[in-house]
Amino acid sequence: MDEPDDAARAGRADARRNRERLLTAAKAAFAELGADVSLEEIARRAGVGIATLYRNFASREAILEAVYRRDVEDHSASATRLLETMAPGEALHEWMRRALNYAATKRGMSSALASITDGSSELYAYSSRLYVDAVTLLVQRATESGDIREGVDPMDLLGALGGLAHGVGRADWQARALRLLDILMDGLRYKQPTLRPAPE
């Protein structure tokens, strides 16, 4: 074997592991301590030096964006994984439950996220596109299987999720939001359509 090549591969693998450790540590630190947590604290939790953190992320905003981007990608991709193991209607329900649970976990970094995901940002457009694609797939499959009624607009479901997430932070929010989601899903399963047409 070519030893320099082996060393280079090992170095790249170490770099990937360090980046993943930093992202995992940052997510937990932001959730527990808020978006103002020190970068030194994130590095300490990840078990790396502050120089390693800065080699991967130039600023607090950069690591916050990377955490958010990874979470959005993981949650969006879970739509396909859920469809492989659940009936389409249950997959849709579970995906929406996870969306609400994620809203609860990111509460500590919500103010900082607002500054990097405003309506005009590339990151906002990117995350919106992934979510729209995921819920569109789930609604399509659940409609085709007969698990939910016809005529459901995926954008309505995303809007409903946004409304349910609005009260995050209240003591009873999560239990109440999940109950309301169950009611919403019961309505989607009701087969006598009373829906107004989706707006053009």
Where is each model-derived feature located?
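Basic, helix-initiating cap at the start of DNA-binding domains
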Residues: 1-45, 62-65
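Amphipathic alpha-helical segments that line or abut small-molecule/effector binding pockets
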Residues: 24, 89-104, 133, 178-186
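Short linear capping/connector segments at secondary-structure termini
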Residues: 111-121, 197-199
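Alpha-helical DNA-contacting segments of helix-turn-helix folds
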Residues: 57, 64-71
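Hydrophobic alpha-helical connector segments
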Residues: 66, 73, 77-105, 120-123
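Short hydrophobic/aromatic patch on the recognition helix
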Residues: 47-57
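C-terminal peripheral helix-coil segments that are non-catalytic and often amphipathic
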Residues: 1-6, 133, 137-145, 170-200
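Amphipathic alpha-helical packing segments from all-alpha helical-bundle domains
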Residues: 73, 119-155, 159-170, 175
